[in-house]
Amino acid sequence: MAIRKKSSKNPPVLSHEFVLQNHADIVSCVAMVFLLGLMFEITAKVSIIFVTLQYNVTLPATEEQATESAFLYYYGIKDLATVFFYMLVAIIIHAIIQEYVLDKINRRMHFSKTKHSKFNESGQLSAFYLFSCIWGTFILISENYISDPTILWRAYPHNLMTFQMKFFYISQLAYWFHAFPELYFQKTKKEDIPRQLVYIGLYLFHIAGAYLLNLNHLGLVLLVLHYFVEFLFHISRLFYFSDEKYQKGFSLWAVLFVLGRLLTLILSVLTVGFGLARAENQKLDFSTGNFNVLAVRIAVLASICITQAFMMWKFINFQLRRWREHSAFQAPAVKKKPPVTKGRSSRKGTENGVNGTVTSNGADSPRNRKEKSS
């Protein structure tokens, strides 16, 4: 049995190709340094800032909750360290999904380079959207958002968060920050980088805005709603790559996308335009995290409306492009002539008829004239 040669040589250490091929292992080593730091008293004080959530407050038990105290959290500058650590975790999870799930499917399906990159993108995002949607829904149910929608604006500012709420926002920020180095690790094309930067920037802008302005209740509801619609799109695209005749998922996504934009505007106007506008405390106070002033409310609504308009504009262009491609694909099939059978009778029909009708010249052929004369 012949010895199989290696497909590629090992690149030099710390070279460009070495970092791309082994970035998950390198990041894992960096993350392990923070975890090992927890084992020693000297470094534990620094490592704990990166690994665990900071700024916790213990509220004493009340008469309604006489059994246990409540542990709540607020945000601060140390959250950047926590976001950095979980950004490393997101890079590791991204590499695991890519290597053990998506790459195996790609080898079986034999996609082209264009489909390969789009399949990887949809595979990663569909996993993230599904996980975030389930996690966010669990928080909504556990904190009674569904049974009492007024919690979106009641008792603002919402500067104190539960562990699940704060960890959710930290994870969201970490994931979208990890998308920046992934542009380098995944060898994203130069023409696709501007689109990706706008895409990532919009997520970070709105998630960080909801987190810093203490609009975490509204932000959570809108994220779950948006993630569900986006999950449906990317899972439909995955099915489309396996079977190009599959279109049902896109049709359902198109309807839910429009409804999602409408619900986003309704909830935003209801919360910011009516709920917070009628609140008694409308003074800017950084110490308590109260940003319920007219200028901030207008800025929040304007940013949401502009983003929704931008998404609808992209959606309309996407649908028009799909319709043009679909009509262009069907046009040759409509114009295509039926196959002509070879034979003497078919040639006579072609020569003597137009659109299936016999002409006068055909009826008065030389043979017919000979029969008449006889």
UniProtKB/Swiss-Prot annotation:
Keywords: Endoplasmic reticulum, Glycoprotein, Membrane, Phosphoprotein, Protein transport, Translocation, Transmembrane, Transmembrane helix, Transport. Residues 1-29, 103-121, 181-192, 236-251, 319-374 are cytoplasmic. Residues 331-374 are annotated as: Disordered. This is Translocating chain-associated membrane protein 1. Signal peptide: none annotated. Residues 334-347 have a biased composition (Basic residues). Residues 352-363 have a biased composition (Polar residues). It is a multi-pass membrane protein. Glycans are attached at residue 56. InterPro entries: TLC-dom (IPR006634), Translocation_assoc_membrane (IPR016447). Belongs to the TRAM family. GO terms for biological process: cotranslational protein targeting to membrane; protein insertion into ER membrane; response to unfolded protein; SRP-dependent cotranslational protein targeting to membrane, translocation. Residues 117-326 form the TLC domain. Involved in the translocation of nascent protein chains into or through the endoplasmic reticulum (ER) membrane by facilitating the proper chain positioning at the SEC61 channel. Regulates the exposure of nascent secretory protein chain to the cytosol during translocation into the ER. May affect the phospholipid bilayer in the vicinity of the lateral gate of the SEC61 channel, thereby facilitating ER protein transport. Intimately associates with transmembrane (TM) domain of nascent membrane proteins during the entire integration process into the ER membrane. Residues 51-81, 143-159, 214, 273-297 are lumenal. PANTHER family: TRANSLOCATING CHAIN-ASSOCIATED MEMBRANE PROTEIN 1, TRANSLOCATION ASSOCIATED MEMBRANE PROTEIN. It comes from the Eukaryota. It is found in: Endoplasmic reticulum membrane. The modification Phosphoserine is found at residue 365. N-glycosylated. One of its GO terms (cellular component) is endoplasmic reticulum membrane. The chain crosses the membrane at residues 30-50, 82-102, 122-142, 160-180, 193-213, 215-235, 252-272, 298-318. Interacts with SEC61B. May interact with Derlin-1/DERL1.
